[in-house]
Amino acid sequence: MADKMVRTPKCSRCRNHGFLVPVKGHAGKCRWKQCLCEKCYLISERQKIMAAQKVLKTQAAEEEQEAALCAQGPKQASGAAAAAPAPVPVPAASLRPLSPGTPSGDADPGPEGRAAACFFEQPPRGRNPGPRALQPVLGGRSHVEPSERAAVAMPSLAGPPFGAEAAGSGYPGPLDLRRPMRTVPGPLFTDFVRPLNINPDRALGPEYPGGSSMHPYCPFPLGYLDAPPGVPLQQGFRHVSRSQYQGGGLVSEPGGDFQPSYYLPPPPPPLPPLPPLPPQPQFLPPGYLSALHFLPPPPPPPPPSSFSLTVLFDTDKENTDDQDAEVLSGEPSQPSSQEQSD
């Protein structure tokens, strides 16, 4: 039992920290999984190196398998060509054309000779060759012109003739590739801009005698510049239609102050009518004021009573005392006047 325990693989990180923990069932549960000490760092680097070596081994095995398939491809293609010399229809997209010339000097061999000269070529090595691993290529020179490749890559542009045209022109079978017409090389860049007309008198000035590529600066004619004789000065601008003056929308006026060339903004739209006010609540019932005319007139004041109680205030008392004093002073004056008369 002790020997079995000793031979059981242990966790190296736990062993670095003084613990013996079996690896079985311990994956992802180590307490020192993120430890950065010197020994644990060496363990993590060793694990990275082992993973890289494993990836390299798998890539080498895949390359060996691809090399074996490439070696078997040409053998199978040559055996199939010898067994079936008749032309086999192959899609034009998978054909890689070469020059139709042969070592014997024939200018245009027949379709049988071209079909016999076909063989399958293995494309460049890659991880996934795909369904187009075997591509038939015409025999002869290995050099292919770019124009011929473009013509075969787009068979829809120059399709084979049908009916009487095919019989009259002697169009070959499906494997016979017509020689495409050579395109006339044109300039890389075509200038579609209108030619620039420059006055030779103004092309070069005395300041720059050697600057042939410099264009003069022609300022716009403004109102304060000297105008030639017979031309009125520009004193303002007004906006006119293009039919009156083809040079632009601004023309000069014979006189007047400067006028702005913008339009006044349109008047604002009229305001919508105000909504009617809600009816005010009536505190008096309708017809109440009209009923006031039918009320009886107020009764007349009562007649004065025979017995009246007069209440004299202090001010009234003072007024009565003054009146009594005046009456008393006026009474003795009357006999004196009588005496004077006697």
From Swiss-Prot:
One of its GO terms (molecular function) is metal ion binding. Its main location: nucleus. SMART domains: DM. Testis. Residues 331-342 have a biased composition (Low complexity). It is found in: Nucleus. GO terms for biological process: regulation of transcription by RNA polymerase II; sex differentiation. Residues 91-131, 245-342 are annotated as: Disordered. It holds the Pfam family DM. InterPro entries: DM_DNA-bd, DM_DNA-bd_sf, DMRT. Residues 263-284, 295-305 have a biased composition (Pro residues). Residues 11-58 bind DNA. GO terms for cellular component: chromatin; nucleus. Keywords: DNA-binding, Metal-binding, Nucleus, Transcription, Transcription regulation, Zinc. Belongs to the DMRT family. This is Doublesex- and mab-3-related transcription factor B1. It comes from Homo sapiens. The gene is DMRTB1.
